[in-house]
């Protein structure tokens, strides 16, 4: 959410930003919110004047009574009563205007970083860099579900019976591999100085509205019927929510956190063959990294976060690349974002396995996350997030890049201690 003062003084910058995000339908909202803000400030000015006048007249009532000037006293009382009535009306009006302004401000997108390429959707994202050499083996690589079934590691039919489409049973060595990857991700981030958390898996609507746009919420989140609770789509939501209405001393920054959680998403719509199996599902587990920092440090942390993802995947012998997300592909709260994509030797292309974002002070402004400074007073923090790893999708990249011709799976050195010392998962 933008600062209303910034919008008031820079309406053309805000409008240009909206155009760059290809959201022209929101352009009228800028002028509308400016008019509402003007009306709100005029009402506040009138209310301040009335309070000053009321206080001045109220002081005279006692004087009039002491002087026996009852008529003057009654006249003053009537003026005070009239002012009180108008003040009550103004207060109600201000509350209504504040709500209208907030609703509009919540849908006006954040100002993107100047380095973000202008583009309409993800097809116009720009490759930044490749890490590791993508390879295609001499043998044919099966679909990831077929690989898992050959290892007796997945049961989709049973999951459809118990839960419907978009769910899975992992078992045996594949289930163990799934857990091993998450355990390794946890320790990988702890070794880089991040504090490990297991957060609540449900959050209230106040937090939901603070961390994401309404449209994102509608498309992603499951609501608990009869409760003011939503199942989280990522632990970023509950971890950023942890700081709601908090003032953090500058000396305690940055806050660098890594969190594990199951995640739940609607994933509405039909999907092609490449998004079936365990690629696009309603329930999965994820290790996340979150940073709360001073504004001047946020871009440095942004670069550190995506580099963490690259280093993690390369430690597991998976080639990756980074993509700069274009303006039209950025969610409304994001200032800048890059996707981390893993190489698929079966498809001979990269696919998304994580996303790193800086949101400026958008989430902090919505949730009241401020920094305490002796020199600057209290000011809003910056927040960032990035995926460490999200199996089972990451399993697709892992299995394809570590598949042997006989169907067995190589276990990289980094994971073996989490797999009981195994170096290979054998075909059953």
Language-model segments: residues:
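TRNA-recognition modules of translation machinery and tRNA-sensing kinases, especially anticodon-binding
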Residues: 27, 130-428
């Amino acid at each position: 959410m933008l600062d209303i003062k910034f919008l008031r003084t820079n309406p053309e910058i805000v409008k240009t930003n909206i155009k760059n995000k290809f959201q022209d339908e929101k352009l009228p909202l800028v002028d509308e919110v400016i008019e509402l803000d003007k009306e709100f400030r005029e009402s506040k000015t009138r209310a301040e004047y009335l309070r000053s006048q009321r206080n001045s007249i109220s002081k005279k009532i006692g004087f009039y009574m002491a002087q026996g000037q009852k008529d003057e006293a009654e006249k003053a009382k009537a003026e005070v009563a009239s002012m009180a009535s108008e003040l009550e009306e103004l207060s109600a009006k201000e509350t209504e205007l504040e709500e209208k302004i907030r609703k509009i401000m919540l849908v006006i997108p954040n100002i993107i970083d100047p380095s973000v390429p202008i583009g309409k959707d993800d097809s116009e994202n720009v490759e930044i860099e490749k890490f590791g050499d993508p390879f295609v083996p001499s043998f044919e690589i099966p679909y990831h579900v077929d690989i898992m079934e050959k290892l007796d590691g997945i049961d989709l039919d049973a999951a459809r019976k118990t839960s419907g489409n978009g769910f899975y049973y992992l078992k045996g060595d594949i289930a163990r591999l799934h857990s091993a990857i998450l355990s390794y991700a946890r320790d990988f981030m702890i070794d880089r100085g991040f504090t490990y958390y297991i957060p609540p898996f449900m959050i209230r609507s106040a937090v939901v509205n603070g961390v994401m746009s309404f449209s994102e919420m509608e498309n992603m989140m499951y609501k608990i019927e009869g409760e003011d609770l939503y199942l989280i789509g990522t632990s970023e939501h509950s971890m950023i929510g942890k700081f709601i209405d908090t003032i953090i001393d500058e000396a305690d920054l940055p806050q660098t956190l890594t969190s594990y959680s199951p995640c739940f998403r609607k994933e509405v719509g039909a999907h092609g063959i490449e998004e079936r199996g365990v690629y696009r599902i309603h329930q999965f587990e994820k290790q996340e990294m979150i940073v709360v920092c001073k504004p001047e440090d946020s871009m440095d942390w942004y670069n550190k976060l995506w580099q963490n993802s690259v280093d993690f995947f390369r430690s597991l012998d998976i080639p990756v690349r980074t993509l700069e997300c274009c303006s039209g592909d950025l969610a409304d709260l994001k200032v800048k974002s890059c996707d981390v994509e893993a190489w698929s030797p079966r498809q001979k292309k990269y696919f998304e396995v994580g996303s790193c974002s800086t949101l400026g002070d958008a989430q902090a402004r919505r949730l009241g996350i401020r920094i305490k400074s002796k020199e600057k007073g209290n000011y809003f923090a910056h927040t960032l997030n990035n995926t460490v790893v999200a199996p089972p999708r990451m399993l697709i990249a892992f299995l394809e890049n570590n598949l042997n011709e006989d169907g067995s799976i190589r276990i990289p050195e980094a994971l073996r201690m989490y797999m009981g010392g195994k170096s290979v998962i054998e075909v059953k």
